[in-house]
């Protein structure tokens, strides 16, 4: 799965960059996309709908804090996402950039069954403005193939 991850070409891949990549890419792929969607427990960064499938997406990005900040942002994103998991008919995802710090953070979850158990997808934004999706069942293989 490593072929999908591309090195970032941005100096700092901010949350707004991740959201921008996903909005453009999802729309190009035929998804209906809304941002800042009000839910029962706050706002989701993005909602995407296509062919009867609905995703609620919480996006996180980099700041100048390096690995520690990426780890904190990722964990905060997971908490926000879990608080918004109120509709069993929707799919839920955390989005982040394919930067070394975020990939390294993800490696801490290699032995965790949480993504599969909670059915959480990964939406990963690349520096070339492309994106890809990792389904919950494929996350361990993705982590294993993207060692930093």
Where are these regions (language model features)?
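Acidic-basic catalytic patches of nuclease active cores, encompassing PD-(D/E)XK
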Residues: 1-40, 49-52
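Structural signal for conserved beta-strand scaffold positions within catalytic alpha/beta enzyme cores
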Residues: 35, 58, 94, 122-124, ...
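Conserved catalytic cores of phosphodiester-cleaving nucleases, focusing on short active-site segments
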Residues: 46-48, 52-66, 84
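Active-site-adjacent loop/helix micro-motif of nuclease/hydrolase catalytic cores
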Residues: 64-77, 102-106
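Histidine-anchored nucleotide/phosphate-binding helix
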Residues: 78-86
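Nucleic-acid nuclease catalytic cores
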Residues: 85-128
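Charged, low-complexity C-terminal accessory regions
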Residues: 121-148
């Amino acid at each position: 799965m490593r072929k999908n991850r591309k090195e970032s070409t941005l100096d700092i891949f901010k949350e707004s960059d991740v959201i921008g990549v996903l909005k453009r890419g999802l729309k190009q792929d035929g998804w209906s996309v809304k941002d800042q969607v009000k839910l029962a427990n706050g706002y989701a960064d993005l909602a995407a709908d296509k062919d009867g499938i609905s995703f609620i997406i919480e996006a996180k990005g980099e700041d100048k804090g390096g690995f520690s900040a990426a780890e904190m942002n990722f964990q905060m994103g997971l908490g926000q996402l879990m608080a918004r998991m109120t509709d069993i008919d929707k799919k839920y995802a955390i989005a982040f950039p394919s930067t070394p710090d975020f990939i390294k953070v993800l490696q801490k979850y290699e032995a965790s069954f949480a993504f599969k158990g909670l059915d959480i997808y990964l939406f990963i934004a690349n520096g070339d403005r492309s994106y890809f999706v990792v389904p919950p069942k494929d996350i361990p293989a993705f982590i294993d193939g993207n060692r930093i």
